[in-house]
Amino acid sequence: MTNFDNLTPKEIVRELDKYIIGQYQAKKAVAIAIRNRIRRQKLPDIWQKEVLPKNILMIGPTGVGKTEIARRLAQLSGSPFLKVEATRFTEVGYVGKNVDSMVRDLVEISVNMVKKERMEQVKDKAEQMVEERILDALIPESRKPQNISFMGLFTASQQQQPSPEERRSLRQKREEIRQKLRNGELENEMIEIEIEKEISPFIGALGQGELEDLGIDLGSMLGSLMPKTRQKKRMTVSEARRTLLPIESEKLIDMDKATQEALERAQNRGIIFIDELDKIAVKSSGSGPDVSRQGVQRDLLPIVEGTTIMTKYGPVRTDYILFIGSGAFHMSRPSDLIPELQGRFPIRVELSSLTRKDFVRILVEPENAITKQYQALLSTEGIELIFTEDGIEEMAKIAYELNQRLENIGARRLYTVVEKVLEEISFEAPDVQEKKIIIDAKYVMGKLENIISDEDVSSYIL
C-alpha cells in the first residue's frame, strides 16, 4: 500500500499499461483521481473535509477496457472495489434492489479484505494452534489437563493423575508425532475434531432482506443470543488443517478494530463502478418504465453527492467514495441524465473502439495476455505452444473483421476467436504425441475458415 502511495500519476498509468492496451485518456483520468486521494490524506483536517473526489464518467463501446481499468486500479491501490449495473436497481417503493445496497456491498467487501489481511498477519501463530489441535486429536491422552472447576474438586479427585515418567513419555511421543506431522507423513490419517457451530435462527418469515436495507442484521443479533454447539467431525489431517486454520485465525483477530479499519477504508478509499449508466439515461416520457429509470437516477443522486448509509457494521459516509460511471451511450447521451446527476460526474473520458493493431498488441503485450495464459495452461501437459507473428496477425484480423460485420464487442471477440482456434488442442492435449505446436496463419485459417465463410454460423459461434 505504501509503495502505491508513492507512485506518481505517470507511474500509475505505466502500471495500468501492463494490463490494458491504449485508452490513455481514461487511464490518465483515473490516475489523477487516485493521486488526488493520496494528496488529500496529507492535508490538514480542515482541508480534508473540503476536498471531495471528482467522479468520472467513461463513455465507450463494450469490450474496450472500461471495467478493467477501474478493477486494475483498485487492485494496485488496495482499494475496496465494487462493480454494479445501474439496471439492477429500482426506485424506492418498487420491487427490486435499492441503490443503498451498493454501499453495503462495498463495506462487506472492505470487511472481508481487512479480515483477510489480518488473518495473513496471524497465520504463523494460527498454524501453531492448528498443529496443537491436530496433535490432541492424534494423541488424545497427551492433551493438557483442563482447569478443574469447583465441582470437579469432588468428582475428579478420584481420577488417577499420570506419573512424571508417564508425562515424560507422552511428551516424547507427542514430539515424535509432531515431527512426522511437519514432514507431511500423516496427511491422510483420519482424525476426529470438535468444531464450534452456531445455531442459526430461522428468520425467513421476518423479512431479513428488508431489514438489511435499513442496516439491521437480524441474523447476527439473534445468532449471538443462541447457544453454540460443539460438533465432532471425522476428516483427514490435511482437511482438518484447512478447516481449523480460519477458525483459529479468527480467534486471534480483534474484529472490532478490523471492522473500524474496514469502514474507514470503504469511506476514504472505496471505488464503486456503476456500469450501464446509459440504460437509465433516457428522456422521460412521463409514463411507463422511464418513470422508474428517472427514479433510480434520483435515488443515486444523494449517494453520489454524499450521504450517510446505515450498514450492519455501522454508519458509512459516501462523500469520499470514488464513483466511476460507465456506458456505451449509443441510444442515449450523457445529457439525457437528470442535470443534478450529470453535475456529479464532472470528468468525462471517451474510450475509443479497438483497431486491428490494438488487437495484435492485446495478444502480445499485457502480462496476462490470453496467449500467455494458454501457453502456461498447456505447459502443465508438457506442451510447448508457439504463436508466430503471422498467426497473431491473422487472429487479430479475423476478430476485427467480425466486429465490423457483426456486433462490435471489442476485445471479447478476440478472446472468442482464440478459444475457437485452440479448442481442439485443449481437448486433445493429454493424448497428443507432438509436444511442440506452432500456431501460424495457416493453422488459424484451417480452424476458422469454414465458420467465417458462413455468416449465419459465425454469428452464433464467434
From Swiss-Prot:
What residues does ATP bind to? I21, G63, V64, G65, K66, T67, E68, D275, E340, R412
- Does the keyword section mention Cytoplasm? yes
From which domain of life does this come?
A: Bacteria
GO BP terms: protein unfolding; proteolysis involved in protein catabolic process
A GO CC annotation recorded here is: HslUV protease complex
InterPro entries found in the cross-reference section: AAA+_ATPase, ATP-dep_Clp_protease_ClpX, ATPase_AAA_core, Clp_ATPase_C, HslU, P-loop_NTPase
- Which UniProt keywords are present, listed alphabetically? ATP-binding, Chaperone, Cytoplasm, Nucleotide-binding, Stress response
Classification via Pfam families? AAA (PF00004), AAA_2 (PF07724)
Q: Where in the cell is it found?
A: Cytoplasm
- The question of whether Chaperone is a record keyword is answered with yes
Q: State the Gene Ontology terms under molecular function.
A: ATP binding; ATP hydrolysis activity; peptidase activity; proteasome-activating activity
Q: What family does this chain come from, according to its entry?
A: Belongs to the ClpX chaperone family. HslU subfamily.
* Self-association state and partner proteins as the record states: A double ring-shaped homohexamer of HslV is capped on each side by a ring-shaped HslU homohexamer. The assembly of the HslU/HslV complex is dependent on binding of ATP.
Q: What does this protein do, in the record's words?
A: ATPase subunit of a proteasome-like degradation complex; this subunit has chaperone activity. The binding of ATP and its subsequent hydrolysis by HslU are essential for unfolding of protein substrates subsequently hydrolyzed by HslV. HslU recognizes the N-terminal part of its protein substrates and unfolds these before they are guided to HslV for hydrolysis.
| The protein's name in its UniProt record | ATP-dependent protease ATPase subunit HslU
Species of provenance: Pseudothermotoga lettingae (strain ATCC BAA-301 / DSM 14385 / NBRC 107922 / TMO)
Q: What does the record give as the organism's lineage?
A: Bacteria, Thermotogati, Thermotogota, Thermotogae, Thermotogales
